[in-house]
A protein has these predicted regions:
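Catalytic-domain carbohydrate-binding cleft regions of carbohydrate-active enzymes
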Residues: 1-258
Length: 258
C-alpha cells in the first residue's frame, strides 16, 4: 500500500492511491521493523491523506472490561500516536461497538466511527448504509457511518465475487488477482460494471437511500478477509471517470470519507 501511494503521490488528487490501515496493532508491528526511510515515507503519505490508520488495535468483541479497554487505547507510544494523524475508529466484521470504546475515542479527540456489520452474525439498529450521531451521557457525540461489510464494495461493479474463500491453503495454493483477471478496463467490461452499479444504486434509492454520495469499503479478492491492496482498483476508477460515468468515483481513506 505504501509503494502504491508513493507511486501516485504526484498525480492529481483523484488519481492517487489511498489505503486505510484496518487495525493499529499490525501497523505497530510494521513500524517497529521498518527503516527510518520507510517510516518517513509513511508519515509523508499520511500527511498527503493517502494513508489513514484505525485508532483501534483490533476489531474487538464488545465484552472487554475497563482495564482491557484502557490498554487498547494506550497501545502505542504517545509520541508515535501524535505523528499518525488518526481520525477514525473502525469496527468491521466483528459485531458490537460498546460505549466504552466510543468514549475513549472521544477522549483521544476522535469523532468518527466507521462500521460494517457482518449480516451473517447480527443486524444493524439503523438502515444500512447510513450515518447517525451517537450521543454520550456527557453530551459529547460521534458521527457514525454504518456501512456495508468490506466485501460488498466489489459487488457494486460485478455480478458476483471473483473468488470468495478463506482456506488454510489460500496463501500457498492460490494467488491474488493479476491485471486482466479482475476490474478489466476495456470498454465492454466498463459498461458491464456500470450497468451493475446503476442497478445497485437504483435498488438503494427505491429502499429510501437519499444521500447524495455513497461510501464503500473495498477488499481484494484473493482471500477477501484481511487482504492486501488491489492495485487494479485505481486504474478502474481512473477509466470510469474518463468515460464520464456517474457517479464519479474517488479513492479515499476512511477519515477523508467521513
Amino acid at each position: 500500500a505504501l509503494d502504491l501511494a508513493l507511486k501516485t503521490k504526484d498525480e492529481i488528487p483523484e488519481n492517487r492511491f489511498a489505503w486505510t490501515v484496518e487495525a493499529l496493532d499490525p501497523f505497530y508491528s510494521w513500524w517497529n521493523s521498518a527503516s527510518e526511510d520507510r517510516r518517513e515515507s509513511m508519515l509523508d503519505m499520511i500527511e498527503n491523506k493517502q494513508i489513514g490508520i484505525n485508532a483501534m488495535p483490533f476489531h474487538i468483541h464488545p465484552y472487554a472490561n475497563k482495564e482491557q479497554w484502557d490498554e487498547m487505547f494506550d497501545w502505542i507510544p504517545k509520541d508515535m500516536w501524535s505523528q499518525l494523524d488518526i481520525e477514525v475508529g473502525m469496527q468491521h466484521d466483528v459485531n458490537g461497538f460498546p460505549r466504552a470504546a466510543a468514549t475513549r475515542l472521544l477522549d483521544r479527540d476522535i469523532h468518527y466511527i466507521w462500521t460494517g456489520i457482518n449480516p451473517h452474525w447480527g443486524g444493524s439498529p439503523v438502515e444500512q448504509p447510513g450515518a447517525f450521531w451517537w450521543k454520550m451521557p456527557d453530551d459529547r457525540k460521534l458521527l457514525v457511518w454504518s456501512g456495508y461489510p468490506y466485501w460488498q464494495g466489489y459487488l457494486f461493479f460485478a455480478e458476483k465475487e471473483w473468488r470468495l474463500q478463506q482456506r488454510e491453503y489460500a496463501n500457498t495454493q492460490t494467488s491474488w488477482p493479476r491485471n486482466g483477471n479482475i476490474l478489466q478496463t476495456d470498454d465492454v467490461s466498463m459498461h458491464g460494471a456500470y450497468d451493475v452499479c446503476v442497478k445497485r444504486l437504483k435498488d438503494l434509492r427505491e429502499k429510501g437511500y437519499d444521500y447524495p454520495f455513497l461510501t464503500l469499503t473495498f477488499t481484494n479478492e484473493w482471500r477477501c478477509d484481511n487482504d492486501g491492496p488491489m492495485p487494479q482498483l485505481l486504474a478502474f476508477i481512473k477509466k470510469w471517470n474518463e468515460m464520464g460515468f456517474k457517479p464519479m468515483l474517488r479513492m479515499k481513506t476512511a477519515g477523508e470519507a467521513m
